[in-house]
Amino acid sequence: MPRVDRGRSHHVPVKHLRHGRQAPDLSARLRTTVVVLVLGALLVAAARFLTETPPVVSDDIEASASPTTADPAPSTRGEDSTTTSDEESTSSTTSTTLPDRPTDVVPDWTVGKPWGEIEGLTMFRGNPTRTWYGVGPVPTDPENLWSYPGSGGMCGQSTVGGETTTWCGTGWTGQPVVWERPDGVTEVIFGAYDKSVHFLDAETGEPTRPAFPTGDIIKGSVTLDPDGFPILYTGSRDNKLRAISLDRDRPTELWAMDADVVNGIWNNDWDGNPVVVDDILYEGGENSWFFAIRLNRGYDGEGLVTVDPEILVAVPGYTDELISRVGRNVSIESSVAVYEQRVYFANSGGRVVGLDVSKVREGEAPIVFDYWVGDDVDATVVVDEEGMLYIAVEDERKTDRAAELGQLIKLDPYTDGDPYVWGVPDPGGAGDGGFWATPALGDGVVYISSHTGRLLGVDTTTGEVVWEEEIAHHSWSSPVIVDDTLVAATCAGELKAFDLSDPRAPRHLWTHQMSESCIESTPAVWKGRIYVGSRDGRFYAVGDL
């Protein structure tokens, strides 16, 4: 295993500069064009070299399942432009709306935009910075259009600590994938508490493929490969992180990695949502470890998709010092965020970590940011265009550190000094408080639902709470923003919508009673409909009649 420095460091030698510049004259433009073409060719050649060079892999960590072998696919889409609308091309030779994206980099201009080459909401919060939420319009007079299954409910039994409980519906985070298939079908994909991944026609709610069974419940959100490979990535409480093919007669497991591939110290669930950047999958597990895995996606001689994964980096998310402070509950339940060439994750011990992944293909990912927020972080780190971090923290342990910092925190991971920018308190008194939901970035305001029943709007510059709405207690679902409309699900089974024309004073538009049970899952907004599951055992499509 590559050596990883666990020491604390906030300093990055060079911060990316973002500034304007005067337009050159015509001759300068011609010279610039030539330079750009030459540099572009060099970048493409370099990208191909990187993808063809064998990575450094740990000697003592191997994937537990036998993967499918294949010729490697061409270099993924590092030099292509990211799609931003139906009209924009994904080809760097025809698109004039977005700059080229270097391989293994998530540029600042991808914040708030869709990710990848297919049309769809392919992962939790839509992109690697976790800042894109779907496509409008948002319904204006919503009704339940259909629910799934037609009868009964999606329920399963799961055992934790010797206690067996029946779980129904979809849970936290539980956001569905919605995507436009090449055959014209809009498909919704989600994992559920009946120990299955389900595939539905977004128009009718009827199954599009057989459900994929797992050995235990699925709490987290699934990921559809963003580069067009017919692969779905998901974890389960059955200890497995999987890659599932979607180009066979039925969804088929291509590869699985067991959580005990390392010596974890909490449990073996996979709640976090995998993120894929140029053939590298990043994921954290409840075994308390972070992984960077090269997928080696390709196709066999019959044209069927294959993977041949290899672990590039495996890093414990904890330190001995952290365990001495908070105990052994240091699992990574949140999803990984990626910005430029940094990967961020947070764990249940309150540790927020940033890794430099510029040499991840060589098996290197040194820690460049390390900060303790004092309590459990299950919500996902959100990164804005300037690389600032928004961290939503629970209030369970009642530590002095958490009381000092607050429960919604903004951090500057690039500063040489104290990275703490501001914090908003949300204590729970004698009970739990704080946030399980992941923040949604708006226009100068960040929005979030709290366990204590508050829907907040917070100024991103000052940390001032500029707006607050009372909602149901235990609201863990993450709010979403589409077409200047904020949509929030509550634990009272409601969907609420607010007009963000004035982001500091949202105007209530409607409240829809979707279910009589708690909605813990995060909704997906897609072309006039809202898709989300409930703890009542059902999954819903909501829209205008």
PLM region descriptions:
Residues L121:
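Short glycine/Trp-rich loop-beta-loop segment that forms part of the substrate-binding cleft
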Residues S95-G116, F124, T131-W172, V177-D271, ...:
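Extracytoplasmic/lumenal domain signature
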Residues S64-T97:
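Extracellular mucin-like PTS domains
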Residues L42-S66, T76:
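C-terminal region of N-terminal signal peptides and the immediate post-cleavage residues
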Residues V4, K15, V56-V57, T69, ...:
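Intrinsically disordered, low-complexity segments enriched in proline/serine/threonine
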Residues M1-A28:
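Terminal targeting segments of Actinobacterial cell-envelope proteins
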